[in-house]
Amino acid sequence: MKQSLPDVSVCLIYLAGMAVWGFVAGRILPYSWQDETKYPFRSLPFEKNGRIYEKIGIRKWQNKLPDMSKVFKGLMPAKKLEGDLAQKLPVMIKETCVAEVTHIFLGLAGVICPFLWKGLGVWCLTFAYVLGNLPFILVQRYNRPRQMQLLKSITQKRKTCVRKSYKREGKEREDTDFEL
């Protein structure tokens, strides 16, 4: 008699495989495919540039979530913003898009399980898997508008400083000549 794994075990193996696949796909997705100013990454009106998530206490719990940049230090940019923020923020903003796409994919991959395998355990595992990816999506939706605003502020301050510097030196310069 042939013995097979219980459906919940097969589902668990499938979900682990999808997590690995999602991680690898997230690392190879080109940043150019992800425009933080357009749908689906642009902050929606009801999100109020991420402030809506403060109602669920996101500031208190977001740093308690596992951080893959600490696990795979060479593969992912660190989340700490040190040094030249104007240079690092665009990368961080793109990384929020990558993370959001990855966790949405993982959530959708989890929804498929009950259609492939049967049992209450499969439903429980699916529910936990989908629900477990939701906080990561919310953190990206919360942080991205804040990072974009910070980058805009830094860029504006640098432009102002350069303009003032050139005015003191008695030089005129076109806005298009500014290097940030």
Residue ranges and their predicted role:
Residues G17, W21-A25, L29, A109, ...:
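Alpha-helical membrane-inserting segments
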Residues I28-W33, T37, K118-V122, N143, ...:
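Membrane-interfacial segments
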Residues L89-G121:
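Transmembrane alpha-helical segments and their cytosolic interface motifs
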Residues Y31-M92, S153-E179:
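Membrane-proximal soluble regions of multi-pass membrane proteins
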Residues Y14-L15, C113, V122-N133:
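Hydrophobic core segments of alpha-helical transmembrane domains in multi-pass membrane proteins
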Residues I13, G17, D67, K73, ...:
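Hydrophobic alpha-helical transmembrane segments of multi-pass integral membrane proteins
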Residues M1-V24, L85-V91, L138, Y142-L151, ...:
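Cytosolic-side membrane-entry/anchor segment at the start of a transmembrane helix
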